């Protein structure tokens, strides 16, 4: 199977976690896009979705799926999203698509987090993928120095030669060179830096289930 075929397979498998008649949380990224396309096929079975980014909201709407503001609901049965890296314990790095803050907010409301990814995303140790940190623009340099003090190499994420601006009007610093032994501890440590909006470590609220695409089919992990 190609990488896209693996993503397609896990997107299909994730449909079984969709509760009929409810509002579900939907993530951002290439694998989440495959899931949205599958969700469009059963849109009449759900009430709608909460999107973790403007891009996801637009894709959901293009399929005729109602998009709800998170402030309109109290709870969701499930949040379905991809990951840039995931461990066998369900800790993840997310934020390659620059939607980490909204992803973390929506995931916090869901009773269950289902991660969908191709099998290459399963790792023994997080950190080979650069760790995204969303920051208030005026604090960019201050935060970068503190991230460097943690042993990483911070780089401001650019788009067309200018700082990428998130849906929240913030910047992203990608931290290279980290080998993350204790994801939950590092998540708390970085989140405590003044000027950080959030870090793309999902360890304190990690995945409950992972659907991983492999050459042999979809592998399911429960945490």
Swiss-Prot record:
The record's annotation in InterPro entries points to: NagB/RpiA_transferase-like, Ribose5P_isomerase_typA_subgr, Ribose5P_isomerase_type_A
Q: Which enzyme type, at the first EC level?
A: isomerase
Could you tell me the Gene Ontology terms of the biological process aspect for this record? Answer: D-ribose metabolic process; pentose-phosphate shunt, non-oxidative branch
Q: Does the keyword Iron-sulfur apply?
A: no
Q: What is its EC number?
A: 5.3.1.6
Question: What pathway does this protein act in?
Answer: Carbohydrate degradation; pentose phosphate pathway; D-ribose 5-phosphate from D-ribulose 5-phosphate (non-oxidative stage): step 1/1
Which residues bind substrate per the record?
28-31, 81-84, 94-97, 121
Q: Which GO terms describe its molecular function?
A: ribose-5-phosphate isomerase activity
Catalytic residues of the enzyme:
103
What keywords sit in the KW lines? Isomerase
- Name the GO cellular-component terms: cytosol
One Pfam short name = Rib_5-P_isom_A
Respond yes or no to whether keyword Transferase is given for this record: no
Q: Which reactions appear under catalytic activity for this entry? A: aldehydo-D-ribose 5-phosphate = D-ribulose 5-phosphate
Provide the function of this protein: Catalyzes the reversible conversion of ribose-5-phosphate to ribulose 5-phosphate.
The UniProt entry's sequence similarity note says: Belongs to the ribose 5-phosphate isomerase family.
Which HAMAP family does the UniProt record give?
Rib_5P_isom_A (MF_00170)
Q: How does it assemble?
A: Homodimer.
* Protein's UniProt name: Ribose-5-phosphate isomerase A
Q: What is the lineage of its organism?
A: Bacteria, Pseudomonadati, Pseudomonadota, Betaproteobacteria, Burkholderiales
């Amino acid at each position: 199977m190609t990488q896209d075929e693996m993503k397609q397979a896990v997107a299909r498998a994730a449909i079984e976690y969709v509760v009929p008649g409810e509002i579900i949380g939907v993530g951002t990224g290439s694998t989440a896009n495959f899931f949205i396309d599958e969700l469009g096929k059963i849109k009449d079975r759900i009430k709608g979705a909460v999107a973790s980014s403007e891009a996801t909201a637009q894709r959901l709407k293009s399929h005729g799926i109602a998009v709800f503001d998170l402030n309109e609901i109290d709870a969701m049965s499930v949040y379905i999203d991809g990951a840039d890296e995931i461990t066998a314990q369900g800790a993840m790095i997310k934020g390659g698509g620059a939607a980490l803050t909204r992803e973390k907010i929506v995931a916090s409301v869901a009773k269950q987090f289902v991660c969908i990814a191709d099998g290459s995303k399963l790792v023994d140790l997080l950190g080979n993928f650069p760790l995204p940190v969303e920051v208030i623009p005026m604090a960019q340099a201050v935060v970068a120095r503190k991230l460097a003090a943690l042993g990483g190499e911070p780089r401001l994420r650019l788009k067309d030669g200018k700082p990428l601006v998130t849906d929240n009007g913030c910047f992203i610093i990608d931290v290279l060179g980290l080998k993350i032994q204790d994801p939950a501890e590092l998540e708390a440590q970085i989140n405590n830096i003044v000027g950080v909006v959030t870090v793309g470590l999902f360890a304190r609220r990690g995945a409950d289930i992972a659907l991983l695409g492999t050459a042999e089919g979809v592998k399911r992990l429960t945490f």
